[in-house]
């Protein structure tokens, strides 16, 4: 299944989460597209709730179904809680950490920066958005790319870096210091529903 590249606002409204990170999609019309008001949101079945939760997380991180399922299966082989490990693996993606560091305004923009070769890991260019960053590794902007307007604008708007990352804004360099804890990951996701979905 290919990655969705259509209007994120429509998907955000359908799933009830902000994929842009701004929350603007939900401010004006906080109900699914095609409906004429919030009261018409239909009640979902148990399967529907599980599917919706899976789609929320998949679209949030911008991962296609094949990669999403592969990461889920990998998380199941790790010690600890399956759902929590799954979310930690998604959070450790290079494109996501570029976004978390504030080098991009959205994960989609971060993915483009990685794909176009603007991002280094431990000083080496990595152009694979799904690259899994390990604790202790550094993420930086390539010297020739440091004047890109999209990066400057993103850094100006960014006012929060998670505790599992450190950022040197002058050097445009950050370090993934440790794996995140569940309390530091998206609270609007119920990963237990996703585990149930794939266990059917």
UniProtKB/Swiss-Prot annotation:
InterPro entries: Ribosomal_uS4, Ribosomal_uS4_bac-type, Ribosomal_uS4_CS, Ribosomal_uS4_N, S4_RNA-bd, S4_RNA-bd_sf. The keyword RNA-binding applies. Keywords: Ribonucleoprotein, Ribosomal protein, RNA-binding, rRNA-binding. Residues 22-43 are annotated as: Disordered. One of its GO terms (cellular component) is small ribosomal subunit. Residues 92-152 form the S4 RNA-binding domain. Signal peptide: none annotated. One of its GO terms (molecular function) is rRNA binding. PANTHER family: 30S 40S RIBOSOMAL PROTEIN, SMALL RIBOSOMAL SUBUNIT PROTEIN US4M. HAMAP family: Ribosomal_uS4_B. This is Small ribosomal subunit protein uS4. It comes from Geobacillus sp. (strain WCH70). The gene is rpsD.
């Amino acid at each position: 299944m290919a990655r969705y590249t259509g209007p994120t606002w429509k998907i955000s409204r359908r799933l009830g989460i902000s994929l842009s990170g701004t929350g603007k999609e939900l401010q004006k019309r906080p109900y699914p597209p095609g409906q004429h008001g919030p009261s018409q949101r239909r009640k979902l079945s148990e399967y529907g709730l599980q599917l919706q939760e899976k789609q929320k997380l998949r679209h949030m991180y911008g991962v296609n179904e094949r990669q999403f399922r592969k990461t889920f299966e990998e998380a199941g082989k790790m010690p600890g809680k399956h759902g929590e490990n799954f979310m930690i693996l998604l959070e450790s993606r290079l494109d996501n950490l570029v976004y978390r560091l504030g080098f991009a305004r959205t994960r989609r923009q971060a993915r483009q920066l990685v794909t176009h070769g603007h991002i280094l890991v431990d000083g080496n260019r990595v152009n694979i958005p799904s690259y899994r960053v390990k604790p202790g590794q550094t993420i930086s902007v390539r010297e020739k790319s440091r004047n890109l307007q999209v990066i400057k604008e993103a850094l100006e708007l960014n006012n929060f870096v998670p505790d599992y990352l450190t950022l040197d804004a002058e050097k445009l360099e950050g370090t993934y210091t440790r794996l995140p804890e569940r309390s530091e990951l998206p609270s609007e996701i119920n990963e237990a529903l996703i585990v149930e979905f794939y266990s059917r």
